[in-house]
Structures are given as structure tokens and as C-alpha cells.
Amino acid sequence: MEIKRDIIEKLKAWKENPRRKPLVLQGARQVGKSWALKKFGKECFEDIVYINFDTMPALKEDFRRTKVPAQLIRQMEIMTGKPITPSSTLIILDEIQECNDALNSLKYFCEDAPEYAVVCAGSLLGVALNRSGASFPVGKVNFMTLYPVSFAEYLRAIDAQLYRAYEMIDTIMAVPEVIHQQLTDAYKSYLVLGGMPEAVSAYIDTKDWEEAKAIQDGILQSYSLDFAKHINNKDIPRVFQVWGNLQDQLAREDKKFRYGDVQKGARAREYEGAIEWLCLAGLVHRVSALETPRLPLSAYKKSNAFKLYLNDVGLLGRKFDLDVQTVLAGDNLFTEFKGVMAENYVLQSLVRQFGNSQYYWTSGNMAEVEFVLQADGRIIPIEVKADKNVTAKSLAYYRKQYAPQLSVRLSTLNMRKDDDLLNLPLYLVDKMSQFVSVAD
């Protein structure tokens, strides 16, 4: 089944913008970047010229020889056998991180040929630029990032009627109980499946969890193969060590990343490069601790205290080797993992809505709040509870210490607001930006 992705509407808006620049679509491997650009091209253009620098290396030489858009257009026409016209052709440059000269040419398309619709995709673009020191056309391109399929996108694909009910939830009031339970069940299935498009599509078509798991395993394997292909030989073992240890770090109660758990006696300077590579590749999200929750949060982060979450909760479940029915049924055997699974799920949504700079707060052994968000000039603490047990004291301690205008608790309970505390069901986290803006 083809999954409708929200990124298509954003691409359509880019097309209609009279001040558009060449577009770079970023994102981890296997999240659907190439598919999205081709889908956009089919819906909005008469024709597509598709260039993949990984499979068409001969074009690299053409981009090395000239940066003149007219000459490059002619070379692409000859290579593909298709005419390129500004109003009706979408030019897709895929795996652009493989050709630094093509990246640099975007500046000239912006300045000298803005009438052409040029879009690019690169899974390891940040890694490639960091490794090679290549120049980048700063200010001459537009950026978008594609993430794994969100819960809302997943819901739209599996149950159109339930999705319509979900879309109508736009005020702070209790959700009808039957809808609340159905959405909670859908959330649990999303925890298992995650958002890698191929796995989601396969499950929707077959309802076979084993097939979806096999696809997830294949994606994890492809990530590992990328390590060997794109990392300097001396750094490969450390990236493998960090990647292989992530689930163990997250399984601990505090989830704080400890270098010594990767290898006994390990130091930060030995593994910081490996962590940076995984972050640049979009495979992990780094969440830093705060010295104190003050604006701007970035000025108060602790660089030496952080957690690393995966880019997809379904892949995290595979790294834990969790049994599907254990997750769906909420079995007691799942207790020690459901907290981190819920946190990973929430973080993915926060990154999509608010960007990649996320933080958490702790007061040592007294209390810990899973996420602290900066939005609309406010600091919003977010507590994540994987079930209906919301009696923990951490958020209460934070509220007493800092008196935030608004606090959010995410759990499997229904929606309600108690003074400055907004209780949201976990299935509504994709609407976080909407609800925090109206929760005053």
C-alpha cells in the first residue's frame, strides 16, 4: 500500500513559492526521500528527470567541468534522453552527497536559472560535508527534512474512519471513551511497527508482523553496511560499538549515555566522533541535560550529559528483540521497556514539530523530567508515562521549583487540563504544537 506522506503538501507549497530556491531534502536512509520526490514530480509536473549520482557516476565529471546551468541542463537531457523545460520538468538529483560539484552547482541554479525546479536528496549529506570539508551553497538552497512515518500518517493509512475522528480532536476536552481506546490500541501497534515506510506498507498489505520485522531487520543491516562504506577505517569499530550499545544504554533507568558502558575505560574524546556521525546520518537523536531551565535552553545545556534515542521506535523495538504480542497486550514482561519506547516515540514527534534541539531536566536523585521544550517564548516541561500510572513526583517537583506557565503530561489516560497541567494521551503527541498554543 502506498502511504500518503505530509511532506508532499510541503513540496507543493515550495513549488508555488515565487522565491523558491533549489531544494535539499534531508533524512536518514529508508525514510522515503526518493519516493517522495518522485511522487511529487508525478503529481505536479508533466515529466521528471531523475539523476542518481550513486548509479550514474559519469555525470559527476559533467558537474566537475562546468557550473553553468544551461550546459548542465543540456548534459542531463543527453544522458536521460528527455527535454527539460522550466515550467513542466522536475529535476531530481538523488544521492547528491556523492557529488560535491553538484552541490556547488545549486548556487548557480539559484542565481542564474531560478526558473528550473531542482530538488535533491541526500541520506548522508551532513556526514559527507563534515568528512570532506566541501563547500556548501549557504543561503542558496531551501531545506526540508523527511522523518519516518508519523503516528498520524500511520493512522490515516490503516483506518480512515478512525483518522477522521482523530483529526476532529482540536479542543481540550475528554475524547469519547470508545475512540480513546481505539486510538490507544493504534498507538500500541505503532510502537511495534514504527515508521519505516517499507515496514508500515508491508504490514498494512499483509497484516503479517513477521514480514514487517524482517524488513526492520534488513534496514538495521543496511545501516550497518553504511558504516563500512562511509566511515574512515579507524572510526568504523567505534561507530559499531556505539550503535550496538544504544539499546543497553536506554534500558537503564536513567538512560544517560555512559562511555564506560560502550567499552570499559572509554573516554568521551574517543567516541564523540562516532556519536556525531550517527547524529549527522540521522540515525540517532541526541537529547542534552539542562543545567537549569532558562531561556534560551541552548545556553544552559550540559554538553557532557545526554541521552541517545533512535530515529525510529520500531527499530528500537527490534534492537530490544521485543515480542509483538508482549507490547500489544501490555504484558508485565514489557514493563521495563515500555517507558523508553514511549519516550522514543514522543521524541520523534517533538523533533518533527519543534526541531532537533531537545533537552531533559534532572535534579540528581530527586526528580527527572523526560523533555523540556522551548516554544512560543515559553519553557514547557513534558513528562512521559507509558501507561495510566501518573503518580510519580518528578513533574510536581519541577513545577514547585520553577512554576512554569504550562506543563504537559503524556500517558494513556484521556485528555484533561488541571490548572496549568495539560494531560494529553500519547496518541495526540503529533498535535502537541497545536494544543500547547491554545492551552493558556
Per-region residue spans from a language model:
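Hydrophobic positions on the alpha1 helix immediately C-terminal to the Walker A/P-loop
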Residues: 36, 40
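N-terminal pre-Walker A segment at the start of P-loop NTPase domains
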Residues: 1-14
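Interdomain motor-coupling "hinge/lid" segment immediately C-terminal to the ATP-binding subdomain
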Residues: 129-251
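Short glycine-rich substrate-engagement loop in P-loop NTPases that contacts/grips substrate
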Residues: 55-87
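Structural recognition of the conserved hydrophobic beta-strand(s) that form the central parallel beta-sheet
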Residues: 92, 117-123, 145
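Hydrophobic anchor at the beta1->P-loop junction of P-loop NTPases
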Residues: 25
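Conserved lysine of the Walker
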Residues: 33
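Accessory nucleic acid-recognition modules appended to NTPase machines
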Residues: 201-373
